[in-house]
Amino acid sequence: MSTRETFKISLLAKMPKDVINQFLSKDKTPFSVLFLSLLVGILAGLVGTYFEQAVHLVSETRTDWLKSEIGSFLPLWLAAFLISAFLAFIGYFLVHRFAPEAAGSGIPEIEGAMDGMRPVRWWRVLPVKFFGGMGALGSGMVLGREGPTVQMGGAVGRMISDIFRVKNEDTRHSLLAAGAAGGLAAAFNAPLAGIMFVIEEMRPQFRYTLISVRAVIISAVAANIVFRVINGQDAVITMPQYDAPELSTLGLFLLLGALFGVFGVLFNYLITLAQDLFVKFHRNDRKRYLLTGSMIGGCFGLLLLYVPELTGGGISLIPTITNGGYGAGILLLLFVGRIFTTLLCFGSGAPGGIFAPMLALGTLFGYAFGLIAKVWFPELNIEPGMFAIAGMGALFAATVRAPITGILLVIEMTNNYHLILPLIITSLGAVIFAQLLGGQPIYSQLLHRTLKNQKLQQQDLPPQSPNS
């Protein structure tokens, strides 16, 4: 027997048996949890992928109607207004009448559910978010489909737990988190970002165990495979592939990150302010709420005719920007304009997310920054498109406070793996400056606001009599 083998045997003999058994027992993941995670991922992938196709179908149908039947007996501007107003009305009505928790992104609802503070009524959230999101996003409003897919994915996870009568709370928690990861993986064709989003952004709520992490990974991979089978394996955003930038330009990426760090804190404040202003305006009165939402949707129908860059989630706008054709001044004007339209749509409580609008804002300012830097520093080999990609990750990192997720998300969406170093520098710079200014992550703010409103509503309820 060799000296090495003798040492191994003596070392194992000195270790308490309960320590060895405990270590091995931690690695015994129940097969049932893995199977249910796979099922959650497949269903979340189907829901997320077909939700995307449904939104595209509504948008294309709206455009076809304007080009043909309706445009023949109504003025084009009036037809555009009425169609988008009706689509928005569907979204707002379904939310207000059947599932108020389906308003907005939905990600804070999943985080609240993981903490045991919010219920997941999947039987009403799934249809309301799906069809309400079709209406709101199809109207041309500045909303993303990524938040809704995360909420619907989480709802799928809870649905599977209920259907299979899962009683173990840790398993139910793992399937809820797995559904959220699968939803994001299907929305962006980004499995790594889906996994990291749950592990990093939801870290205050996520219960870290071998089982829960494996469940999240399996679900995200399964959902992404479903997406690729249906939509193909191309990246979500088609744009130029860049080589690694010169080291002399890295300081500019850090400066861009600092600017986004400041803006991210301001942007988060404006989002919650917009939500509070809308609530004060409609006071949860259904008629006023629906009229306000319909008018907003109709206005975006008009904008689609004249300034389409200010409408929609923004994913289709990103490659248009990076292909050139816009000056820095126009890009900055669009940046300011889309800030306003994003706040208007998301603050109104429509069933839609903010991921895609944030990425579009990051692209607009980042590309404008790159164009300006190219003029001011002609001796440097500057590609403005690199700063657009870095801007996407930086704004995400500054607002969501999940830099690793933002980096992976942008890389997977654009296939620009050579830009990982500038993305890290820009994103970390954005997070550090945002923290120095004392800002809080956007989804934490939104969850806190939801829980505060829930507590106020409970206090307003009349006390029940002992005999009731």
Swiss-Prot record:
Gene3D superfamilies: Clc chloride channel. GO terms for cellular component: plasma membrane. It catalyses: 2 chloride(in) + H(+)(out) = 2 chloride(out) + H(+)(in). One of its GO terms (molecular function) is antiporter activity. A motif (Selectivity filter part_3) lies at residues 353-357. A motif (Selectivity filter part_1) lies at residues 104-108. Residues 1-30, 115-121, 165-174, 200-212, 280-285, 437-468 are cytoplasmic. Chloride binds at S105, I354, F355, Y443. Proton-coupled chloride transporter. Functions as antiport system and exchanges two chloride ions for 1 proton. Probably acts as an electrical shunt for an outwardly-directed proton pump that is linked to amino acid decarboxylation, as part of the extreme acid resistance (XAR) response. Homodimer. This is H(+)/Cl(-) exchange transporter ClcA. It comes from Vibrio cholerae serotype O1 (strain ATCC 39541 / Classical Ogawa 395 / O395). The lineage of its organism: Bacteria, Pseudomonadati, Pseudomonadota, Gammaproteobacteria, Vibrionales. The gene is clcA.
